[in-house]
Amino acid sequence: MKKSFIYILTLAFLLLLSSCGESRQTRIARTRAEYEKQMRENRAALKIGALPTLDCLPLFIAQDDSLFKATGSDIRLKMRNSQLDNDTAFIGGSLEGMVTDIKRLEYIEKKGVGVKRVATTNAYWQLFGNPMARIFEVKQLGNKMVAMTRYSATDFLTDVALKGVKTQGMVFSVQFNDVKLRLKMLLNNEMDALWLTEPQATQARLFGANMLYDSRKAGFHLGAIAFRQKAWDDETRKKQITDFISAYNQAVDSINAHGISRYGKIIQKYCGCNDKTVKALPKLKYQHIQVK
């Protein structure tokens, strides 16, 4: 009787091990299948690169208010803190579109990538001096470091701001691409001057940073939304892009009707700023994407 019991117990244990093994194999197969499915869906989706800046606000609203979803197209935002990270993905084809600036697009085109620019955004850039360094004017930037991004609006604007200005020494343009890191360097007294757009520019003003130059002073409109020409010409992408534009324009209408303050929570979520910053933001108007 005892031997029979041991035999039954051993058999039950072996069956349990066998079932566990099968279960593990099944789980591995299912995980692999799910991963491959996710990859296929991601490749098929329209992927748009965005930054934690207010020129991307219509995209954030279209995402969180389900305007993209309502179109029936799979439209996905890919958030990054750096223009260069978006550019790399755009050039490599893992993004179909992105919010960027005209100078970056010119650089990308020189790399041999076809680009279709569909809109100019309301982005502007302001140059701030470190209040700890007591920098109040552009002419004080001699022998100082200015944080910017190479071959971008901020690189171009550095030259514009310094044109005809006599400084006591060379101005050192240093590359810091992460917009959040750039702001932290100001707050931590690690950079003499730097370019910021909204809402980081408002955060800098609240910190007491001195604005040295505003891109709007020269009438520049450098913000842009663009798609890869290859994606633009692709028949399978046409509906997705049309749906993206429709959702974007709906978000623009809502912002212009109600003001950006209505979307404070969304701004905080995507841009990482606090309620004080949201309340101090300037009034901004947005334009439709109008493709000719």
PLM segments and residue spans:
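Periplasmic-binding protein-like
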Residues: 121-131, 206-237, 241-245, 283-288
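Sec-exported extracytoplasmic/periplasmic mature domains
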Residues: 64, 91, 110, 163-167, ...
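Proline/Glycine/Serine-rich low-complexity intrinsically disordered segments
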Residues: 132-139, 163, 169-171, 183, ...
